[in-house]
């Protein structure tokens, strides 16, 4: 099963990517999380950062998978009707083609909102080639 958590790439450079994911009631994973108060599961927020990091890393001969997560912090619920703005920076290259990233996802309840949006999730994580 694959969930595409990138609706748009709004900025990209060799070391940074910014993406948007608009969360709707149609998202299958919101059906049971939580009944009567649907919110984007925390693991899906992490997956949004991982998908952005894969896109930033570019095509590889061996697919990149999540190898490590460090200092992951959650700060806000992401409800249907909101947009998650994901920013991922390439932090450093590790041994064996692994790459460490810093990620942060902000909650945008309205793309025209003024002020600083709330941080929904932030942390460091590493992607490494899949071991077959």
Whereabouts are the PLM-identified features?
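Residues that act as N-cap/strand-start positions at coil-to-secondary-structure junctions
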Residues: 3-4, 66, 119
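Hydrophobic residues in beta-strands and at strand termini
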Residues: 23, 74, 127-129
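Hydrophobic beta-strand-centered segment that forms part of the acyl-chain substrate-binding groove
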Residues: 50-90, 124
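Generic helix-packing signal
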Residues: 23, 56-57, 107-109
């Amino acid at each position: 099963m694959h969930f595409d958590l990138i609706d748009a790439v709004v900025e990209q450079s060799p070391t940074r990517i910014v993406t948007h994911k608009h969360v709707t009631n149609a998202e299958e994973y919101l059906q049971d999380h939580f009944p009567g108060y649907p919110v984007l599961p925390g693991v899906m927020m992490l997956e949004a950062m991982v998908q952005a990091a894969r896109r930033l890393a570019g095509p590889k001969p061996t697919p990149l998978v999540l190898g490590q997560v460090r200092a992951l912090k959650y700060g806000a619920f992401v409800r249907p009707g909101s947009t998650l703005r994901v920013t991922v920076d390439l932090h450093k290259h590790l041994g064996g083609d692994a790459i460490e990233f810093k990620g942060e996802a902000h909650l945008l309840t309205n793309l025209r909102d003024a002020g600083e949006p709330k941080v929904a999730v932030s942390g460091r994580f590493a992607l490494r080639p899949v071991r077959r």
